[in-house]
Amino acid sequence: MSFRDLRNFTEMMRALGYPRLISMENFRSPNFPLVAEILIWLVKRYEPQMEIPSDVDTESDRVFFIKAVAQFMATKAHVKLNLKRLYQADGYAVKEMLKITSILYNAMKTKENAGGDQNNDENSKFKFDLGSKIADLKLARQLGSEITAKGAALFDLLGQEEDLRESRTAAIARPLEITETERAMRAAVKDVTESIQMTKDLLNNVSSDEASLEAKIEKKKQDLERNQKRLQTLQSVRPAFMDEYEKIEEDLEKQYQTYVEKYRNLSFLEQQLDDYHRVEQERFEEAEMAMKMRQNKLKEEEKRLMRSGVARDEDSDVDIPEDEGSDSDIDDGQQARPHHPRHTQISGRGGARFIGSMRGGDSEETEDSEIDVDDDDEDDDEDGEEDEEENEDLDEDNDSLEGSSGKPGRTNQSLHPQILEESDNDF
């Protein structure tokens, strides 16, 4: 494609009156929709009544469109187009479309030049209109194609004249026989008579068929009217069983209402039962969980008490050897200082006698309380009561000792601090 061809094409299309502005950049790349639009417009310029499919969405539609345009131009304008270049829709397609536009543009220029030579004023008043001459151009193209076809047929027939001349001459020179001619004429007349009789029979059959069809139609109409009247009668008359039917229908409706109500109640009760089971299950699970928690708590408390009991046993085991050791020391030192064992009688000035011991670790109540604590660690209240009893006994012993300390003489006063000192060490 050259720049000159593209420029000439755009100028010719503008001169022919193409409504769209064509740029030189439109054909740098394939643009099939624009090429299809231009080809349709050019075909309409040749023949406005020509119908060409404008669907070019698919590949097959485009091929069919290009073939239709090329065939039209070949038969009407005697212009041979390259289908491959038209399908490319680029600069090479412009060369093919330039063939069509050149014919139209030259015809327009020739008409303008002829009109300008005759009368420039008339040309200025009446503009050249190619559209008004399209019908004449169409008729001329059609006549030209018919003349060409008939001329070709005539040429073929004239070519067969040499072969048919001898047969025609022999047929003309042969004398006609009356018998054969009469026989042929009678055969022809007989054939014509048979065909006429057959046609009459067909006409008679048609008339009879028409009469039978009319009779059938009339019969059907009568049946239809009779059935309509019967239908109206049946609709107007109330059946004898209608009362019973209505009564049964009412009973059935009541039964259905009762069924629906009972079904709803049953559904509601089932739902309530399910809710109750669910609540009971939740309560059971909560109770089981609480029981497990209490069991775990009791186990932990038991473990804690066992640990505390073991600790107290260890403490008591540690304290007992110390007491034994202290007792042994006291036994060893009995010769050095006097010692008053349990239940000893201390004489005073007034002759009062006190029975008891100042050693808290040697009391029976203290031993019993220690045994109770070691054996039953779970009962904290009992331990507290025993501790209170121990404290009360110790207080009573101390009070009794204090009462006796004021009455005895110096000898007793000298011994009393030793006993208190030993008891303090024992505690």
UniProtKB/Swiss-Prot annotation:
It is found in: Nucleus; Cell projection, Cilium. It holds the Pfam family Cluap1. Keywords: Cell projection, Cilium, Cilium biogenesis/degradation, Coiled coil, Nucleus. One of its GO terms (biological process) is cilium assembly. Residues 300-313 have a biased composition (Basic and acidic residues). Residues 314-332, 363-400 have a biased composition (Acidic residues). Residues 300-427 are annotated as: Disordered. Required for cilia biogenesis and maintenance in the kidney, the lateral line organ and eye. Appears to function within the multiple intraflagellar transport complex B (IFT-B). Belongs to the CLUAP1 family. This is Clusterin-associated protein 1 homolog.
